Amino acid sequence: MIRFILIQNRAGKTRLAKWYMQFDDDEKQKLIEEVHAVVTVRDAKHTNFVEFRNFKIIYRRYAGLYFCICVDVNDNNLAYLEAIHNFVLNEYFHNVCELDLVFNFYKVYTVVDEMFLAGEIRETSQTKVLKQLLMLQSLE
Amino acid sequence: MPAVSKGDGMRGLAVFISDIRNCKSKEAEIKRINKELANIRSKFKGDKALDGYSKKKYVCKLLFIFLLGHDIDFGHMEAVNLLSSNKYTEKQIGYLFISVLVNSNSELIRLINNAIKNDLASRNPTFMCLALHCIANVGSREMGEAFAADIPRILVAGDSMDSVKQSAALCLLRLYKASPDLVPMGEWTARVVHLLNDQHMGVVTAAVSLITCLCKKNPDDFKTCVSLAVSRLSRIVSSASTDLQDYTYYFVPAPWLSVKLLRLLQCYPPPEDAAVKGRLVECLETVLNKAQEPPKSKKVQHSNAKNAILFETISLIIHYDSEPNLLVRACNQLGQFLQHRETNLRYLALESMCTLASSEFSHEAVKTHIDTVINALKTERDVSVRQRAADLLYAMCDRSNAKQIVSEMLRYLETADYAIREEIVLKVAILAEKYAVDYSWYVDTILNLIRIAGDYVSEEVWYRVLQIVTNRDDVQGYAAKTVFEALQAPACHENMVKVGGYILGEFGNLIAGDPRSSPPVQFSLLHSKFHLCSVATRALLLSTYIKFINLFPETKATIQGVLRAGSQLRNADVELQQRAVEYLTLSSVASTDVLATVLEEMPPFPERESSILAKLKRKKGPGAGSALDDGRRDPSSNDINGGMEPTPSTVSTPSPSADLLGLRAAPPPAAPPASAGAGNLLVDVFDGPAAQPSLGPTPEEAFLSELEPPAPESPMALLADPAPAADPGPEDIGPPIPEADELLNKFVCKNNGVLFENQLLQIGVKSEFRQNLGRMYLFYGNKTSVQFQNFSPTVVHPGDLQTQLAVQTKRVAAQVDGGAQVQQVLNIECLRDFLTPPLLSVRFRYGGAPQALTLKLPVTINKFFQPTEMAAQDFFQRWKQLSLPQQEAQKIFKANHPMDAEVTKAKLLGFGSALLDNVDPNPENFVGAGIIQTKALQVGCLLRLEPNAQAQMYRLTLRTSKEPVSRHLCELLAQQF
């Protein structure tokens, strides 16, 4: 199960934090900093997986942004690694830069909820997700 | 198609965000935020009613401010108002605000229940999904109480839209995980299983997660899911890469759904139905075949998606552990990955192969990759990959390759990362012992360990080498020669001095014939290290010296000179001073015969389990050593290397000299054999008979030391009552008094106190437990001024208990004078796990009238807990290993006492498990671990207690390797809060 999803830039600024288990605010801040510390020191020769506390982080870097998913240790690494890509790949984000995530932060949550819910993968079809998001966008 | 674009929607929000981004300093940002907060506050307070758009905009600004890390203390009502809007965009911002802020303000939840109810009933799929997502995101118990009953209905309703079903399934999953008691099982469960057949793959994707979670708790209710999952999987696996259209990802059909289905199947044993099983095996073979086909795309996404399925397939094959052909194929596939250029694949292959190594079918196949794995240990850049390689070498080790693996691990140790050195040391020590054919190799290996990584060689490791050398006379001469040589090094680690000192003190005579290691040379070599060593080591060396005086009378004068020196006799350290004084006196006053008896060679150590293995298990969780313990792939190993146990006669009939040396209660493996042994030695020599095991009532002071675990072969022999109390048959005693259970509960977490009191009699308890043994003192106080007559307390074992728990009692005086107290000693041995406590029946005559009373003796299974410290990672690994439904017991209950964290801690410690900090991500929760020690078996236990202060509830989860124990512990402990 996914414990949290973080999108951070290289400077450690959080662009999205989605939590699937209860943490208090201080703990969230600590987790954000720790994840940034473990992920940014790794290079291309390293795996995309890091043991993290009692969990593991599956992460992928896109330009200046790190997309990190924290999951249980026995979860399937590659499935989550590609889940990140499937999320980023979405047409809805086509040509989107970091700044767009900042200005449209409230929409990003909607995209996340379409694809992940309750810490599980909800929908994997690009087409279905896009159709749903466009439908929602057409609503007032 | 840039669907996300700047300023889309709310202009004011975009302006505000731009302003914040343009702030040059933190101060400027705070100033801008405060200005905005003042603005929003005035808008919300103003007389003019805000329209929906403005409300949405301001709430969204507040949310942005909150996400920047600032506290928000208003605006909640406006957000709640947005929920009742008919416009999607307004509703969405309202729900988002609540989902994000709910942690900090749970009051909010009560306010929104109504709005959620309306949206769930709205029949508008968009609104229903928003409401379901909100419930799933918050996932609190309150949410569960309000909605858990409605969601199954939405999930299985024929007219629910697909997207609603997807959300409902996962929403229900979240509620079930948070509060399983609130989700009623019912006829909907059968229909949920049939969602596996749903046409919409998204619905299946969501439903599989729900079913996987539900079936772990109720495997029987959901077992029809196996055949449905197999046929679904089969359809996906056999489809062409374009058949599934939307659900094909880089030419791989439905990778995530396949992975989820394979994980669901891992909740069950292999299908019994031959047709289903055949179909499944076909699927698994297809996946393995596809791995050999040329890739349909060069993109890494294609191979990742394909391999995600492959690794999950291999997990399932390993889980079944019944198809040799598949296991070997899996192993070959992983072998290819070991040399793949992708680091991810090498890492995952090492990890997966580690579990394959423990299957008898694939162990040999795994071993063929040894060279590649050794190479990985040497060359991988990522430390986590090297760690996996070390794990795999450990897992694949057996007698045939032990020498190679141990020497490679030793070599790796020289450059290994500090974080994993201690673990590598333990692994090397275990492998060396386990697979030693000749023990000289073992001794060399351990001495190498000390040489290479002395700081990381824990006490357990060097105690162990001493135990083995002491117990095996074929290696003693070699050990003496080798340590002597090792000590020649100009700089040697203090642990080497300890081992050398001990071994030469015992077996130095075996090499004394060689003039190069004559007694004076041995002594001066050891003594040259003396001054650089810590107090503990110097104390050990002093014991070596006195042993030298016995072994080599010619060194007596020199050694007495050393002992007599002011630096020893007046040493500031009391221990050293005492040893010097006492050894000096001993060497002067005792005759040669006495000296020879007192300083005789140490008798063999009684052996149960390698203390190192126990330590690794503590580090890695109790299951860590299982691959090694399990002798099936190397049946001969037990015969040779299990031969460490001394012959029973050595121990069960202790010779006088053994007793004199304080070894009648052999030190537990973890106790320093040298310092503790030597300490006892003196006391015993000078106190003589007092050190003999006393059979009469023991003074309280000696209580603890008396409880040092005696030799396992005859645990009770030394404490035995000359006249074991005859148990009266159960028919002779009355039923326990009504409050017996309540009285028993008081003692679950404590060992001492008043067990019972009425106007005549008070019964006090003092007890102490160690491993699987216990001793209990019962104090019977006569509260009257009249003598009790025919006073006879007896212990009765109802039912099977006789075979589970041995209790020996001593008789007490039949008369108890008025105002007097008598004491009764009970020796208790836990033979195996038990559920019901023994009964204590007390009868006497008071003023001519017979009195009878039956109580439950406060001996519960948790008394035999041995706390186990482990790191968070190990805890979770172990926790996962105990994931069979029957291994877990869970209880959710109301708090009966005020919920105080300190009190809870004390109770859990009193219960007997270790409390592990920093394991649970939620600091409010308590996590514990321990091993229940019985004579027949050990039961590893993990527990987790989650208080919910708001609801005044607890959730208690226990996982043990034995089903009834989980349930019983859970019941015992739940009554304590």
Curated annotation (Swiss-Prot), chain B:
This is AP-2 complex subunit alpha-1. It comes from the Eukaryota. The gene is AP2A1. Component of the adaptor protein complex 2 (AP-2). Adaptor protein complexes function in protein transport via transport vesicles in different membrane traffic pathways. Adaptor protein complexes are vesicle coat components and appear to be involved in cargo selection and vesicle formation. AP-2 is involved in clathrin-dependent endocytosis in which cargo proteins are incorporated into vesicles surrounded by clathrin (clathrin-coated vesicles, CCVs) which are destined for fusion with the early endosome. The keyword Iron does not apply. GO terms for molecular function: clathrin adaptor activity; low-density lipoprotein particle receptor binding; protein kinase binding; protein-containing complex binding. GO terms for cellular component: AP-2 adaptor complex; apical plasma membrane; basolateral plasma membrane; clathrin coat of trans-Golgi network vesicle; clathrin-coated endocytic vesicle; clathrin-coated endocytic vesicle membrane; cytoplasmic side of plasma membrane; cytosol. Adaptor protein complex 2 (AP-2) is a heterotetramer composed of two large adaptins (alpha-type subunit AP2A1 or AP2A2 and beta-type subunit AP2B1), a medium adaptin (mu-type subunit AP2M1) and a small adaptin (sigma-type subunit AP2S1). Interacts with SGIP1. Interacts with HIP1 and RAB11FIP2. Interacts with SLC12A5. Interacts with clathrin. Interacts with RFTN1. Interacts with KIAA1107. Interacts with PICALM. Together with AP2B1 and AP2M1, it interacts with ADAM10; this interaction facilitates ADAM10 endocytosis from the plasma membrane during long-term potentiation in hippocampal neurons. Belongs to the adaptor complexes large subunit family. Expressed in the brain (at protein level). Isoform A: Expressed in forebrain, skeletal muscle, spinal cord, cerebellum, salivary gland, heart and colon. Isoform B: Widely expressed in tissues and also in breast cancer and in prostate carcinoma cells. InterPro entries: Adaptor_Complx_Large_Subunit (IPR050840), AP2_complex_asu (IPR017104), ARM-like (IPR011989), ARM-type_fold (IPR016024), Clathrin/coatomer_adapt-like_N (IPR002553), Clathrin_a-adaptin_app_sub_C (IPR003164), Clathrin_a/b/g-adaptin_app_Ig (IPR008152), Clathrin_app_Ig-like_sf (IPR013041). Residues 615-675 are annotated as: Disordered. PANTHER family: ADAPTIN, ALPHA/GAMMA/EPSILON (PTHR22780). Keywords: Cell membrane, Coated pit, Endocytosis, Membrane, Phosphoprotein, Protein transport, Transport. One of its GO terms (biological process) is synaptic vesicle endocytosis. The modification Phosphoserine is found at residues 626, 652, 655.
